[in-house]
Amino acid sequence: MADLNNNLLSPNGKNIALTKTENFQSNPIQISKIIELGDIKVGYLMYNQFTLGFDDDLNEVFSNLKAEGISELVLDLRYNGGGLVSSAINLSVMITGQFDNEKFASFIYNQKVMNVYNSDEELKSRLNLNFTNQLGDGSTINSLNLNKVYIITSNRSASASELVINGLSPYIDVVQVGDNTYGKNVGGPAAVYDYIDNEGNKNPEHTYAIKPITFYIANGDGFYEYA
């Protein structure tokens, strides 16, 4: 350690040992609490990323909010730059719950790709992302059945965060508070890593990957022009 005096660092003889935590993953559920305003119970949730592996934790948070009988929800997405589309849908269902199997969002590709999808009913159904009442593991989603949600945003709120706002807008009253969001209304498949061969061997000389942008993502009304 060192002391700072007059913008100069001088060793102070103190040593601190740090232990590295393997495979550490930050919990995106930053804050969850209930604010009582007279007779009204308001739930407040700061959620910072739509991350794999935290949908169960988020579902438990909504179970607690539901048990406490909140009637209003403030969702803080100021620091949420996006993540998994599936998690964005799950969060949206936790807020609502009354729109099971309705269209939440849909993919819009270029015309050649759309022609392929539209040529077959089964393929065409893959373009739509619907509200569901279950998580991926089959467990029931805890829903608040709200008709209004307040969402706090910043210019760092992007992608899946914007999908929640846009996807819910045709169904409930979404009150956006704060700055305009980033404006990422597109997506694509997982990055193409050509340095990994079919046997899983890596070529260390390959240092670039391709992440193609292949689709817009629209809400149930077909709107996606918010970039």
Predicted regions and their residues:
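C-terminal "post-core" interaction segments
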Residues: 39-45, 49-72, 81-227
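Short strand-turn motif at the edge of the Rossmann-like AdoMet-binding core
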Residues: 78
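C-terminal, low-ordered peptide segments at domain boundaries
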Residues: 1-70
